[in-house]
Amino acid sequence: MRRLCALALILAIAIPTSAFAHGVVGDYVFLEPLIAEDPTPANEWDVVQPSWNKTSAGNNFALGSSLEKVLYLDENYMARVSVGIGTEWHYQWVKNAPDQRGFDDLEMFAKWAFYVSAKHEFLLSAAALLEVPTGNPSVEEQSHTSLGPLFLWEKGMGDLPNWTAIKYLRPFGFQGDFSYLPALGGHTSHLMSADQVVEYSLPYLSNSVQDIGLKPPFRNLYVFTEFNYSQIITGPSGQTFPSVVATPGIAYVSYHFELSFGTQLALNRASVPDTHAVVIGLLDIFYDSIFTKAGNWTINKGFPE
């Protein structure tokens, strides 16, 4: 893992920073969140998403990975439809009990960006999310298949006036989602969740507002905070309290990849037992910038010329 992170940092400095390949709506480039779902259909591979958290019951280490593929482009070559798949591997050190390890549920989704305004850096999308209990029952979140809707949005603030006192607000961006994921059988969880991401883009500041002299890698940094809510609204007694946490972090976004790190802070009493200490990371590859023909294939446009 140390070697992987070191290699990513070396590449971050070496790769040109004049263009981006992910999450582009108008002039704003939205990052890939750590916890929240990404509203933008994209060709991307979350190669590894490591996380460690110390809880009241012990410790949990997870390695997540997911893959997303754009299937449809509109007449302006904006990605409109994508599908994806992902899972996590867990190792849990449980107090006064044997260690548990194995894969979590298999997650699959189909995403549709049904409204895009490049002028206002605004996008709305919807997705269908399916979770199948294909992993180890001792570490899985759910023992029954779940299927439900996901509503997503993102908005850049670039349409604010370029006045002296206001222009520095233009690099702000907002991403969010709301989902309801009921189990299709059994008496276990019906999960409701919502996320809101507030991000500040130093690339946007330098390229679209005012160049303040930042050099790589600082020129390509984002600072962000996610606000994450989740709650089992139908489930076992004593397990239906809402969990609300803040996930602050920093991200480096280049033409080929994103490298992010963050932590989590409890915002209500119910989330304290699961957030004694948390570290989260993400290495996300925008593979259509590397495999420019195969990675950019879509159903309606085929391979790029």
Where are these predicted regions, by residue range?
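Positively charged n-region of N-terminal signal peptides that target proteins for export
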Residues: 1-4
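Bacterial N-terminal signal peptides
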Residues: 6-16
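Transmembrane beta-barrel domains of Gram-negative outer membranes and organellar outer membranes
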Residues: 21-185, 189-305
